[in-house]
């Protein structure tokens, strides 16, 4: 993948008449491809509209990027989990070669990222948003190991915070309880809601670096859970009824009817019984 990235960048330099192209990477977190119009076009109806035809979200800006550029329809993550997939993205290596094959394992010091290569070629490099490659730190603002991202003031290691603010000591989570950061919305508005806040900071950086070649990565922590958002978006789709996917109904029906020993009849010969139904990773991935 690393070679592919740089072949792509080199090809862009020819497209732009030998000039160094600017690079902007916008990354979202657990974003179901069915929520993007540009991907629904490539799916069968039963896959594209698993929640119903009347409940889809329109994504005109993302769709226009796909139409005017290119869209990957055969692109797979070596590990569809946060830390390892991010490690692969910035390094071009398989997760097991980065030191980060599972969540919360820090990237090896020896890893060379695309940002480091571009920085050495004169690019202004910056990173905003969720990083998740610096171990357990949470939120972990501006890690000391920058991996080529010269400006990482607005990089935080992990967490899905909903409210940010600036202080004299730098950025911090705005929603707090007992002076500790929480995932609550708090008083988040169009200036402090996490996505809005990060986008505003990215625009400031783009304005600062506009007269030089730049590479900026904006890693938005949404739409990963908790599934909370500021108004007007919080109530925007309250009137819609989402259909449960057919495959989910089938699986739940099978679970409902099995196993027989869970019933009172099936367990009558047990003097004492403890029934535990445990679910792993039950959140809807969007």
For the regions a protein language model found, what residue spans apply to each?
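Catalytic-site neighborhoods of secreted/periplasmic enzymes
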Residues: 85-191, 231
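Short, well-ordered alpha-helical scaffold segments within catalytic/effector domains
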Residues: 3-5, 111, 195-203
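Glycine-rich, histidine-containing beta strand-loop boundary motifs that form or position
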Residues: 76, 128-129, 156, 218-220
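Active-site-proximal cap/lid insertion segments
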Residues: 21, 30-56, 158-197, 203-286
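Active-site segment of extracytoplasmic enzymes that catalyze sulfate/phosphate-ester chemistry
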Residues: 21, 25-28, 32-127, 136
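Sec-dependent N-terminal signal peptides
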Residues: 2-13
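Boundary at the C-terminal end of the N-terminal hydrophobic targeting segment
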Residues: 15-17
């Amino acid at each position: 993948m690393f070679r592919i990235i740089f072949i792509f960048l080199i090809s862009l330099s020819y497209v732009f008449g030998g000039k160094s192209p600017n690079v902007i990477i916008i990354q979202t977190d657990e974003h179901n491809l069915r929520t993007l119009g540009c991907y629904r076009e490539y799916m069968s109806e039963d896959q594209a509209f698993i929640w119903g035809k009347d409940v889809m979200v329109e994504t005109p800006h993302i769709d226009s990027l796909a139409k005017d550029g290119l869209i990957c329809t055969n692109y797979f993550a070596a590990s569809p989990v946060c830390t390892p997939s991010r490690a692969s993205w910035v390094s071009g290596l398989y997760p097991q070669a980065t030191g980060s094959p599972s969540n919360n394992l820090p990237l090896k010091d020896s890893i060379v990222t695309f940002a480091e290569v571009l920085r050495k070629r004169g690019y202004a490099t910056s990173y905003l948003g969720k990083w998740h490659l610096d171990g357990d730190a949470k939120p972990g603002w501006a890690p000391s190991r920058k991996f080529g991202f010269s400006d990482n003031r607005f990089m935080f290691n992990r967490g899905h915070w909903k409210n940010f603010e600036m202080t004299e000591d730098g950025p911090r989570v705005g929603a707090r309880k007992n002076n500790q950061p929480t995932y609550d919305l708090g008083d988040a508005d169009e200036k402090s809601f996490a996505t809005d806040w990060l986008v505003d900071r990215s625009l400031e950086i783009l304005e600062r670096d506009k007269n030089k070649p730049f590479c900026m990565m904006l890693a938005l922590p949404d739409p990963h859970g908790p599934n909370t958002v500021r108004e007007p978006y919080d109530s925007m789709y309250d009137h819609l009824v989402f259909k449960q996917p057919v495959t989910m109904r089938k699986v739940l029906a099978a679970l409902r009817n099995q196993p027989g020993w869970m019933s009172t009849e099936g367990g009558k010969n047990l003097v004492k019984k403890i029934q535990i139904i445990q679910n792993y990773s039950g959140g809807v991935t969007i």
